[in-house]
From Swiss-Prot:
UniProt KW keywords: Autocatalytic cleavage, Cytoplasm, Decarboxylase, Lyase, Pantothenate biosynthesis, Pyruvate, Schiff base, Zymogen
Keyword set includes Lyase: yes
The protein's required cofactors: pyruvate
Protein source organism: Thiobacillus denitrificans (strain ATCC 25259 / T1)
Amino-acid positions noted as binding substrate in the UniProt annotation, renumbered to this chain: T57, G73, A74, A75
Protein name per UniProt: Aspartate 1-decarboxylase
Single GO biological process annotation from the record: pantothenate biosynthetic process
Length: 126
């Protein structure tokens, strides 16, 4: 059996740029890509916490340490500078891989600097 699972997440990143007239993608600070195990040109899902938009694009590299999260091309209509977003990737795992499965969860501050990394999400209470 194959299962599609969360592979990685950048939690509550702040959009720094929104470039409509740019080749479509989302530029992400290279240090954030590495911390979250997101590869350049990998498909990403973006969930805009500020306006509820959800969309798919791909990741490209921004300068290391820049804090850049730039939503580009048509997706720029769905995110503005200052918006909070969750950026997620998913992968398919077989039963043997599931025994070792753990997502890469990266938490950032308002400047998109890493403040925490985890491999589990705490139990949520209503």
């Amino acid at each position: 059996m194959q299962r599609t699972m969360l592979k990685s997440k950048l939690h509550r990143a702040t959009v720094t740029h929104s470039e409509l007239h740019y080749e479509g993608s989302c530029a992400i600070d290279e240090s954030l890509l590495e911390a979250a195990n997101i590869h350049e040109y990998e498909q990403i899902q973006i969930y805009n916490v500020s306006n509820g938009e959800r969309f798919t694009t791909y990741a490209i590299r921004a300068a290391r340490g820049s804090g850049v999260i730039s939503v580009n091309g048509a997706a720029a209509h769905k995110a503005n500078p200052g918006d909070l977003v969750i950026i997620a990737t998913y992968a398919t795992y077989n039963e043997l891989e599931m025994a070792r499965y753990a997502p890469e969860l990266v938490y950032v501050d308002a400047a998109n600097a890493i403040v925490d990394t985890r491999q589990t999400i705490p139990v949520q209470a209503a």
